[in-house]
């Protein structure tokens, strides 16, 4: 009999505990989802669309040529659209071409790309460079031909190297943290502010994050580097032949090869 009473008491405790939990969950739900009084008054804050059909948008035969829903969501990486940077396909073609001519594997190319980037930081990416580029293996200089690097670079080597801009900037920062360092490009431009060393290479890619002072320094260095450069559209035409015969007769008494006499005067002694 006592056992029956205890069982009933335990059952009541379990039921009461469950009711308490259910009540607590209901209260939590009420706290999360607050009821709005239908009699309350208020003004909702209007949300304006950034691009609306009321704008003066391009039209063809009364139909808008833009997809506004797609345009609102279209936010590509800005640097991917720059025409001063080689496309991903052009960069991949350059990489595969260099790898094939050097006869290297992907792992070996990873080792080659590091010192080549550093070499370009120091020496630039001018299309006129030729000969060899150098990497250091301890204290030993190892030479590699520049021809595969330059000839496979389309459109230009500088546009290819724009892909290395962020990595080069981080490398210069690392070098500056361990001691005084200024790339050769900055030394030639006589850049005096060591804080701008991270921008002192000719394939630095200016973007929206670049500070005003850094942009000015990059522009001034580029202007100084190109100040004495003259580009000619046409060079000397080598396919030139004489199409007329010179039948002019000259004697030893002529003034010069283009003049017979000076109207009776002799040649000056």
Curated annotation (Swiss-Prot):
Residues 1-45 are annotated as: Disordered. The keyword Transit peptide does not apply. Residues 9-36 have a biased composition (Basic and acidic residues). GO terms for cellular component: viral capsid. It comes from the Viruses. Genome polyprotein of potyviruses undergoes post-translational proteolytic processing by the main proteinase NIa-pro resulting in the production of at least ten individual proteins. The P1 proteinase and the HC-pro cleave only their respective C-termini autocatalytically. 6K1 is essential for proper proteolytic separation of P3 from CI. InterPro entries: Poty_coat. Pfam families: Poty_coat (PF00767). Keywords: Capsid protein, Virion. Belongs to the potyviridae genome polyprotein family. This is Genome polyprotein. It comes from Passionfruit woodiness virus (strain Severe).
